[in-house]
Amino acid sequence: MSKVCVIGDGGWGTALAMLLLENGNDVTIWGPFADYIDEMRETRKNPRYLAGVTLPDALKLEADMAKAVAEAEVVVLAIPSHFYDKICVQLADKLPKGCDVVSVSKGFCEKTRKRLTRTASKLLGIEDVVALSGPSHAEEVSRGIPTAVVAASNDVERVLRIQKLFSNKRFRVYTSTDTIGVELGGAIKNVLALAVGMSDGLGFGDNSRAALITRGLAEMARLGCVLGGN
């Protein structure tokens, strides 16, 4: 059993916290607003971000960041990209020494325009942050619907620890050393998804959808290589 703190009380952070708890870990969610954390604790619900889901009694909720991360062996960053740098700055002097840090957010830091693991690594003063990304809706993970993601890091031992921490029969975690490729894929796929949705909304057919997907994937791969991915 590992002591885990999930930074972020959004839908994705909550779904992953429930998964980690189910896997036998001691899990605490940190959220920035004490009133809402109190409401979640009392009602065992997260109506703003993960409606219709009951939070397990064993899932801890905390608005004091120092208390939430105290003695944590793993810290999971489930922070919206536009708040990413601000929360990392708050966390920097509270992060337990030697803990594993996992970024599960998608996108780029709004302020620096850099990848999120790179932003976290710099602001937290640590060498390696694991990226966990893939096609994964929070509401489906919370309901135990089969899901596959990728954990990426240059530190093979660390990424294997994270794979073991998150994996179960319904949540498959693959591993990679291509952190850049995994993060870029997780962020840019949303642009492609929007384009396909626009095509559908305009009433275009399967031909247009297929063209957008195939050419979009090719462009994603080329961009990934240019930016240093494998």
Regions found by a protein language model. Name each.
Residues 10, 14, 30, 34, ...:
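Electropositive phosphate-/nucleotide-binding environments in soluble metabolic enzymes
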Residues 9, 32, 64, 79, ...:
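Fold-independent oxyanion-binding glycine-rich loops
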Residues 55, 61-70, 74-146, 162:
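Rossmann-like NAD(P)(H) cofactor-binding subdomain of soluble oxidoreductases
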Residues 1-53, 60-63, 90:
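NAD(P)+-binding Rossmann beta1-loop-alpha1 motif at the extreme N-terminus of oxidoreductases
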Residues 4, 27, 127-129, 173:
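Hydrophobic anchor at the start of a short beta-strand
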